[in-house]
């Protein structure tokens, strides 16, 4: 099948309300059912589906669904297998394309999860904890960052418990388990188990199945409203369909960014606010492992009265090594995710190359630290004897950051080391100081 034919078929299937059951089956296979696959092996790569692919299918459903259009339950297995095959064929088509634009699309879309769910939620609380940001989110959007962890935990527990209970009860009676109901939390459960603040978070991240989509999806690269609002509110007070828990954790972290962009409270200040927050978060991560010789926001000036040459965002030294972190809050734009070469170049320049070159300038100055007033003032004249490394950090998950850094390294004097805040957090979570420096 051609790419157009695949999209046409997926659009047709997703126009059925019954397609929600296919989404439920996929969610079951890729989460609860994964234990069986790991024990008994997988038939082929097409037996697995990424979270990004499930998001795309859910986005098609909320866009195309006709509520009174259904198919017989006996057809569920056939259509589920067909959807797996269609998505596998679509991926294969992108793998076969040789142009750079589509190769980047393949990297961005099929890269997989960029952080753990608990990281998304934990850093959401930290990213938006500044009073000004916190108040806008809570007062204008009824989104309290202090209850994100408890909300996600309760959602996961509710789904897990009801699936476990239904599997046991239905199996004993040889009854059918609806995959849509399995991932749907009833309104009475929401009211009983969740606090008013937690209910507001759920509501803020919900999309009514009868709602209107602002931007229609034509292909996997298009903006997908489901990613922003991954809790689907089913009609007739049926409940909240939480088919992708991973998407909910990502939305808790990233959807507030879009709200803040739309707010009139910031103007052009949001970028600088995010930059300051990014530096503080990197500093917090570093200080978990290194208690001494850790510095942040150090300006580099030749003399007391001269202009600033550059500045060090975060730095630490350990034994004979020193690490310079340059932190950026630049995100990969939607246009880049669509494969636009000029946009990819621009995003890479602002998020990675600028940070890398700024870091190199810092390293150059630090190798001659005794010549710089500000470094002597901060008792950093000793760093000239260290082996210095330069690392770029992005505040948000940045799809394709490893690939883009690798490709750009060929244009640089020294290799580019770039990662997201979540990657850095994982490294400092898993390893001790000696291992981190090594």
Each language-model region and where it sits:
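Extended, hydrophobic alpha-helical segments in both membrane/secreted and soluble proteins
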Residues: 282, 310-314, 325
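Short, surface-exposed, polar/charged, turn-prone segments marking secondary-structure boundaries
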Residues: 324-327, 351-355, 417-422
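Active-site metal-binding core of divalent-cation-utilizing nuclease and nuclease-like domains
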Residues: 296-312, 316-319
């Amino acid at each position: 099948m051609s790419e157009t034919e695949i999209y046409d078929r997926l659009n047709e299937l997703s126009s059925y309300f019954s397609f929600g059951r296919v989404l439920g089956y996929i969610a079951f296979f890729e989460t609860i059912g994964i234990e069986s696959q790991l024990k008994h092996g997988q038939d082929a790569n097409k037996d697995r589906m990424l979270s990004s692919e499930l998001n795309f299918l859910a986005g098609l459903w909320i866009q195309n669904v006709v509520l009174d259009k259904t198919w017989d339950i006996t057809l569920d297995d056939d259509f589920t297998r067909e959807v797996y095959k269609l998505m596998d064929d679509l991926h294969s088509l992108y793998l076969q394309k040789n142009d750079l634009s589509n190769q980047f699309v393949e990297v961005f879309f099929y890269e997989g999860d960029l952080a753990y769910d608990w990281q998304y939620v934990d850093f959401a609380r930290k990213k938006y904890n500044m009073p000004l940001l916190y108040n806008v989110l809570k007062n204008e959007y009824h989104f309290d960052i202090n209850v994100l962890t408890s909300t996600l935990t309760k959602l996961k527990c509710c789904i897990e418990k009801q699936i476990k209970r239904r599997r046991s009860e239905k199996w004993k009676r040889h009854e059918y388990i609806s995959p849509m109901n399995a991932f749907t939390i009833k309104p009475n459960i929401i009211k009983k188990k969740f606090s008013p603040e937690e209910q507001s978070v759920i509501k803020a991240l919900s999309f009514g199945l009868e709602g209107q989509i602002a931007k229609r999806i034509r292909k996997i690269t298009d903006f997908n409203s489901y990613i922003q609002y991954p809790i689907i509110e089913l009609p007739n007070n049926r409940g909240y369909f939480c088919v992708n828990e991973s998407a909910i954790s990502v939305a808790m972290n990233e959807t507030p960014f879009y709200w803040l962009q739309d707010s009139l409270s910031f103007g052009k200040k949001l970028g600088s606010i995010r930059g300051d927050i990014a530096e503080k978060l990197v500093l917090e991560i570093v200080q978990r492992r290194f208690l001494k010789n850790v510095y942040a926001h150090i300006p580099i000036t030749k003399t007391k009265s001269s202009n600033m040459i550059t500045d060090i965002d975060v730095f630490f030294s350990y034994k004979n090594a020193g690490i310079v972190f340059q932190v950026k809050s630049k995100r990969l734009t939607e246009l880049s995710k669509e494969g636009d070469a000029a946009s990819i170049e621009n995003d890479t320049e602002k998020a990675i190359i600028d940070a890398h070159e700024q870091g190199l300038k810092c390293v150059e100055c630090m190798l001659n630290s005794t010549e710089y007033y500000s470094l002597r003032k901060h008792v950093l004249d000793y760093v000239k004897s260290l082996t210095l490394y330069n690392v770029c950090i992005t505040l948000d998950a940045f799809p394709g950051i490893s690939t883009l850094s690798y490709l750009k390294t060929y244009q640089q004097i020294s290799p580019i080391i770039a990662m997201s805040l979540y990657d850095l957090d994982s490294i400092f979570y898993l390893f001790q100081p000696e291992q981190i420096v090594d």
